[in-house]
From Swiss-Prot:
Gene Ontology cellular component terms for the protein in this record: cytoplasm
Subunit structure: Homodimer.
Catalyzed reactions per annotation: orotidine 5'-phosphate + diphosphate = orotate + 5-phospho-alpha-D-ribose 1-diphosphate
Protein name stated in the entry: Orotate phosphoribosyltransferase
Residue runs in coiled coils: none
UniProt keyword terms in alphabetical order: Glycosyltransferase, Magnesium, Pyrimidine biosynthesis, Transferase
Amino acid sequence: MLAVYQTRFLEAALAADALKFGEFTLKSGRHSPYFFNAAAFCNGKLLSVMTEAYAAVIAELHETCAIDVLFGPAYKGIPLVAGIAQALFHRYDINLAWAFNRKETKTHGEGGNIVGASVAGKKVLLVDDVLTAGTAVRQSLALLAQEQAMPVGLVIALDRQEKVGDSNLSALKQFSVENQLQTRAIITLDDLMTFVKESGKPAVLEKMQAYRKIYGISEAD
């Protein structure tokens, strides 16, 4: 059964065309029966729904994992961390700092690679929309190491739960294992399939089941 924030998130994603069902060719070359584009959450109402969903996940994680700063990789992570920080404070009375990186180092003014809160010596939670190759997130980890920060985890919007290479690990699980970090997602492929089933879309569900049989991890993590 989906949580209320998950249902609201998926309903908003459908309404915004952030979530589409059909035939899509991914960057990996795989032919997927669904497509997710977080950039379509591009107005105040949609951003609010998305950041409140992130906040729900992070508030639960915060109960067992100390977090000082939310970090959003530029550019997509910038509005996310700002909105999530607000949602955490208003909904859960959790007051976290937030920061993001510059794409290019600034040599004048305040300078540096980081904008926002200082991350030095802080427990930092990374936030991004999806994790595929993970290039931006890994670059962020390298930058945070230079800044003497202490990364504690990563939260994304969608975990596709697809195998990476010859392993039976998803991209998110592989990232967790490689970096010894906590990882969470608002929605997993399992959650999405539950939503599709409850929405009365048997044809779509059948295609998703077939897709997962080929590319999905054996068990949900």
